[in-house]
Amino acid sequence: LLHLDVDVLIPAALADSVTGKSAVGIRAKIIVEGANAPTTPEGDAILNDKKILVVPDILANSGGVIVSYFEWVQDKQNYFWSADEVKQNLNDIMMKSFREVEHMATDKNISWREAAHMIGVARVAEAHRLRGLYP
């Protein structure tokens, strides 16, 4: 399946399914990582060399974690949103995140995975700067 002639490939089941060996035969133009860690570092390097856009797992499959956070916030406030509000808030956050990663990748001429990691590290560093070391 990984080697089918498709526009978008979504590895969404297993970690390490896109390896150095399997990446060589991938013909998709875009890979959206639905699974956690579906691409090995060797596979990632080959995909980058082939100029295949990879939307990394930490961006592509973060919707579930975001909605879990929404549930926590609603429970804490005892104020519950409609399904449409949840979808709109999720869409807003996901689109903002996609734009940030795309901008960083383009601006720095790096992969989307590197951009997503850079943004994540910067956010943690800023939180640490503002709040101090959290136990």
Label the model's feature ranges.
Residues 1-22:
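A structured beta-alpha segment of the ubiquitous adenosine-cofactor-binding alpha/beta core
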Residues 12, 24-135:
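Adenosine-phosphate binding glycine-rich loop
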